[in-house]
Regions:
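Active-site-adjacent bridging/hinge elements
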Residues: 31-43, 90
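Structural recognition of the beta-strand scaffold that forms the well-ordered cores
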Residues: 58-61, 85-88, 93, 116-119, ...
Length: 345
């Protein structure tokens, strides 16, 4: 056994927590709220229109695509990417996996930020305007694909049936991508907007050594993607440095705190004070910090008292005081971050 103890944090109670994660809680679905907090924006990077994931657990895809979109806007480029294209390819991949595993692999639409990067690299990308459908229930579609897999005699029959179902529910795939008068394959287009190894996944926990990669033990990391482990001070510095340099950061973390309010557009801790590395670790191990939701961090701000906040682009629509953006306190980010994906600089 390794001298470094590895604690298995795949949680029995995690199944319960996952039911409420990623999508917007019903208690926060309030329209027309007036701003209760006033902020001064120090940095606000450009961003594409805020989208709405609805009841689909696809925040990891929306947030990572939003991060890539903002990265290109800050370079003077304009790109708006299709979540449906990514979701379709993921569904097809998982349907094959379910079939080959004799039904032992559960098809689901949850994931982590690095999963999006792998799917882009493997299957390509589509512009939002070329492939989008606002009325898809992906959880229901995943169940349909599972049933289809169980009823198929072989892979070729399964793939033919699955493609037909996906065409009917999401739409037929365009054979090519047309951008600025040029024609691309989906793979060529993806590589033009996100190169291999352009981004790095980072985290900060003490059950693994710092300055090493490890497979983060969270339920949605079923692909065993590795994250680079650093002290929390280093992680916070990297987040701020990236944003000030014009690079957005994809954020993955806990939204179960009472102080997280989409309807108010603010996330704060009950006790607004900096946490220690050990406090973060304790919260992760006792499940008071869980992997719930992903957003793109696109700015920095402060309130009247000078308290610092990070501006996040959410994917729950625009019905809050800041048009779908949220202000997360620095202490909230420090305590409740599970992982981030940053631009390799």
């Amino acid at each position: 056994m390794s001298k470094h103890k590895v604690y298995t944090l795949y949680i029995i109670v995690g199944v319960t927590m996952l039911l409420a994660a990623c999508t917007m809680p019903a208690k926060q679905q309030t329209v027309g709220n007036k701003a209760r907090h006033q902020f001064t924006n120090e940095v606000l990077l450009g961003y594409t229109p805020v989208k709405n994931q609805g009841s689909n657990p696809l925040c990891w895809a929306y947030s990572m695509l939003a991060t890539i979109e903002t990265e290109h806007i800050m370079m003077g480029d304009s790109v708006n990417l299709s979540v449906d294209y990514v979701a379709r390819n993921m569904l097809m991949e998982q349907t094959r996996r379910h079939f080959l595993a004799n039904g032992k692999f559960r098809i689901n639409m949850r994931g982590t930020m690095p999963l999006l990067l792998r799917l882009l690299n493997e299957y390509g990308a589509m512009p939002y305007d070329s492939y989008n459908n606002r009325d898809i229930n992906y959880k229901s579609l995943a169940k349909r694909m599972s049933t289809l897999s169980d009823a198929s005699a072989n892979m070729s029959i399964l793939e033919e049936r699955a493609e037909r179902v996906l065409d009917d529910h999401i739409g037929a795939l365009p054979p090519h991508v047309f951008m600025l008068g040029a024609e691309y394959t989906p793979q060529e287009f993806a590589h033009s907007v996100c190169m291999r190894n352009e981004y790095m996944a980072m985290t900060s926990f003490t059950h693994h050594p710092f300055d090493e990669m490890f497979v983060l033990e969270i339920p949605d990391n079923y692909n065993n993607d590795p994250f680079y482990n650093v002290p929390i001070d280093v992680l916070m510095n990297r987040i701020e440095k990236s944003i000030r340099a014009g690079h957005p950061v994809c954020w993955e973390g806990d939204i179960t705190e009472k102080g997280f309010s989409f309807k108010d557009g603010v996330a704060m801790l009950g006790k607004e004070q900096p946490c220690t590395q050990q406090q973060r670790q304790t919260a992760f191990e006792n499940r008071s910090t869980t992997d719930d939701h992903c957003m793109a961090l696109i700015g920095l701000a402060h309130d009247k008292q000078g308290h610092r906040f990070y501006i996040a682009k959410n994917s729950w629509g625009i019905d809050n005081p800041y048009g779908g953006l949220m202000y997360l306190s620095e202490n909230y980010i420090r305590m409740k971050t599970v992982a981030v994906v940053v631009k390799n600089m």
